[in-house]
Amino acid sequence: MEDFDLVENLQKTSPSVESDIKSAPQSLGLSLHANRSSPHLSTNGVSSFSGKTGPPVIQGTVEVLTALRQDLQNSGRTDSELWKSCERIQEEIRKLVKLQLSHASRPSCSSSSVSEQVSAETQMGFFSENSERNESVVSSPASKEPETQPASSTSYPDCHVDSSSVSSGYGTFCILDMNTHKAKEPTEPLEPGAASQGQHPASVVQAHGPAGGAAAINFFTQTPEELCASLKEDGSTFPGEFDRNFLGENKISEVYSGKANSGKSVTSWAQRLKQNQSKQAHTEDDCSGPKPGSELNWKPPADTFDLAADAARPCAFYINKPAESPSSWLSDSGTGLTYWKLEEKDMYHSLPETLEKTFAPSPAERPLSQVLTLDPGAIRMKPKEHVAGIQAHGFLHALDDRISFSPDSVLEPSLSRHSDTDSSSQASHNPSQVSGFSKYPSTTRASPVDTWKNHAFQRESRTSSTIPSRYTITSNDISVKTVDEENTVTVASVSQSQLPGTANSVPECISLASLEDPVMLSKIRQNLKEKHARHVADLRAYYESEISSLKQKLEAKDISAVEEWKKKNEILADRCGQLDSALNEATSRVRTLEKNNNLLEIEVSDLRERFNAASSASKVLQERIEEMRTSNKEKDNTITRLKCRLQDLEEAFENAYKLSDDKEARLRQENKMFQDLLGEYESLGKEHGRVKDTLNTTENKLLDAHTQISDLKRTISKLEAQVKQAEHESMLSLRNGAKVPERPSRSNSVATSDVSRRKWLIPGAEYSIFTGQPLDPRDRKLDKQLEEALVPGYHSPPEKDSSLGSSPASLLVKKKRDTPDTPPIIKALKELDEERVFKSWGTQTEKEDSSSKLVNSRQTEPSVNTGRSPEKCAQQRPKRQTSASQRSSSLPPSSRKANTPTKREIMLTPVTVAYSPKRSPKENLSPGFSHLLSKNESSPVRFDILLDDLDTVPVSTLQQTTAKKQLQFLLDDSEEKKYSEKNSDDPVNPSSCPEHSPNGLKKVSTRQAWEKSKSVSLEQCQPGSAAPQDNGFEYTAKIRTLAETERFFDELTKEKDQIEAALSRMPSPGGRITLQTRLNQEALEDRLEKINRELGSVRMTLKKFHVLRSSANL
């Protein structure tokens, strides 16, 4: 800023009035922002040094300004800017003077009105008399140099000022000392100072000390509106400090307002001294810390304000005109000092008021033109710098960079660490109490009104500083350089010899007691007068030089301005031509662009239509694409389903093809089986024919046999009648022969013969069955002879044995031949006994045969048969005989049908067959014939012989039946063919005796027929409810049929085992088998099922006849 250009100009010693006028805006900006508590100034102050020097200086200043204006008007070559600047300066001065007068007359009764006045006056750079906080009255150098004492400092907003007055010939010299007493009463309106209205307004000064610097008395050229606006803007930044700093010192405001204090008034120098001493004691106690209610707690580390350490505070001195009234105070712009009337309590009432008035006129009589300023900062300002500093924006940035010093700074004891010979009011002080703060250390305070608010606005001074600056303070012979960057204070030089009249008259340190000396006060006044005289001379010389330089510049500017204007006009004409051509080109270009724009708009419309059509077409195509996608998806799904269906059909076709192959194979197999069945059927038909032929022949033989039997029965009946007759005759003869002695021997012989005849009926019996006594050895011999007679014919065929007399009848004939001749009656009796024996033997044998057959048929294996003990057989024999006799006797023979044998009766028909290898023929032999066999022989031939011999046994007539009824025990029509085939292989001799023809059936082998035939007859066959006939033929056929059935059972069992073994060797059903294997397996399974059914029926049949073991007989 321009303030930095002023640093080097501080060496100038020829001040002028215009420089101060031009430097007013910069000073105003600096004082507004750097220190809001600017000291109160008065526009109606007068100089108390000399009534002679003040008015001429002011008059000269105003005359210079007026002469400058007239010269500028008369010259005709007036610079417009300079002329306007002068007029503006004059107008600003008038406004500020009016504003200050209006503020002086405005009352301040409350703290709110005081704040408003302070705000308005701060913008103008001064405070009115009615401010509540008048810190400018007392200024104490509370700060020290940072290098010397880095202790903390506290602010004391509650301190007020006590004034001491010294009366002299020139007026009253006031000494204000600081104490910590608070003001008890609010301030009252100040008395407005008198000012002459008809003269030019004097320059309004401001004692400015931003952070311990010297006060600068500046002119204010801004309007009140601008000042108020800037103050409001800046006052909002530190409202707390502002109000606190101005509301805390009510005592000082009372001093300035001129209000009479209700307290004690000082009337003598001794009382004033005692009062100052008592206030110093209060300072040690009350000022050791800040007020509890104080909001300002900022403590700079390098600044200390210790009132207890200072016995005598450095005081600011104010000179008041003796002629002034106590209620008025004025500021002398010419000297930079503030003059006012002390309060009544501080005034010396003993001094006559008329005496004071004799020294100087009243303030109202003093013209404003006599006000002088001693501000070297304003003196060194150049006229051109005033115009640049008028703008309001300089207030914000130049506040902390501008510190103005007045010539009154020599009064401050803090200028130097050593003695200050120019300061005639220097009290004894500590060298460490150098005025200055951490950011803006200052060494001087020219105006006492700056020092009071110095410590209260330390932080504002620091925080508002943005540009470090260097200040060179020149007050006549004193030069002080302040370097803000280093926060140091350097006193360049203090020359006591350059201050004339003070070197020998003022000591180095002026104590408070020395200030009370009138001689010292007069010397101080004299020094001040001389100093002010020099300042006035410097100001006059400075302003004259400035005016001359401005005139020269104005003339040079007027000559060069015309040529410059011509050149500028030519340049502007050329520029206008260029602009015209450019304008034409631009218009043509604009027209072409408009045409192009129109064409482009048409194209855009066409393209828009095309785009719309294309977008609609694209939408339609997208819809079609979506439809095609959906249809394609559906088709794909259909294809997949069809593929799956095709695979299923292929698998089904393969399965059907395999099934068709299997069916064809089955058909071929079934066809083959059908052909086999046809061949078997044909063979069975042929066999059936042969069986019929055989049946016819057997029927014929049966008829012949029946006729023979009937003849024999008639013969038997005749013989029985003869026997009865013979018995009757024998009885008669016995009666008659009892008288004769020979009869007893005959009866014994007959008895022995009967016993011997009967005992052989039981096989191996050595005891008689009738008496139970041992047999006679002769009877044993007879039995042996009978056995030997039977043995030679054992191995002979039945046809040949018939001639050997194997029947009982032949035996009787042989006995008759062997015995000697006996009378006929005896013979008849013997024959009768023999017939009875044979009759009983026949029935008994028949019963035993049937019972033994049933018992032996229960056993299916030889091991079981052989394990049976003879004791059990003997025990069971009587039961069997009784059951068989009852069964045979309960059947009437006439209940049979003649020609229609049933299937149930087929199994009961006796057939001659070969015996199963599992049985011995001996088991089938009735126990009644076991005596006929040797002990070591079990050949079936003898059994056959014995069976053949049974044909000649006489049968009861009740058991006889016709030949037609006998046929029901033969084979049915289905089996006739089988037996006819076997008979053809082993034919029976047709010429054989009819009594031997039934025995020919035993030669027929039916094994092949049983293998080929089905077991239909066996399945439905059940044991007959009637017992077998007593006929020998029926018994023999029955035995042969059961034997064949047993053999068939064995064969079926063997075949079943073979089929099961074959099935087990075949692969499992889960594996893959060929068609032929499957067909074979099915055929085997079918065959196995049929065999199981046949085995079941045959097994039941054998169990019924007790051939197989049953659960009932276990």
UniProtKB/Swiss-Prot annotation:
Q: Where is this region: Interaction with CEP97?
A: 382-431
Q: How does it sit in the membrane?
A: Peripheral membrane protein
The UniProt disruption phenotype note reads: Knockout mice show decreased body weight when compared with wild-type mice around 1 month after birth. An increased percentage of ciliated cells in the proximal and distal tubules is observed in the kidneys of knockout mice at 1 and 4 months after birth.
Compositional bias per record (Low complexity), positions renumbered to this chain: 106-119, 881-898
Q: Where is this cross-link: Glycyl lysine isopeptide (Lys-Gly) (interchain with G-Cter in ubiquitin)?
A: 713
Q: Does the keyword Coiled coil apply?
A: yes
Q: Where is this region: Interaction with KIF24?
A: 730-963
GO cellular component terms given for this protein: centriole; centrosome; Golgi membrane
Function (record text): Negatively regulates cilia formation by recruiting the CP110-CEP97 complex (a negative regulator of ciliogenesis) at the distal end of the mother centriole in ciliary cells. At the beginning of cilia formation, MPHOSPH9 undergoes TTBK2-mediated phosphorylation and degradation via the ubiquitin-proteasome system and removes itself and the CP110-CEP97 complex from the distal end of the mother centriole, which subsequently promotes cilia formation.
Put simply, this protein is called M-phase phosphoprotein 9
Species the sequence originates in: Mus musculus (Mouse)
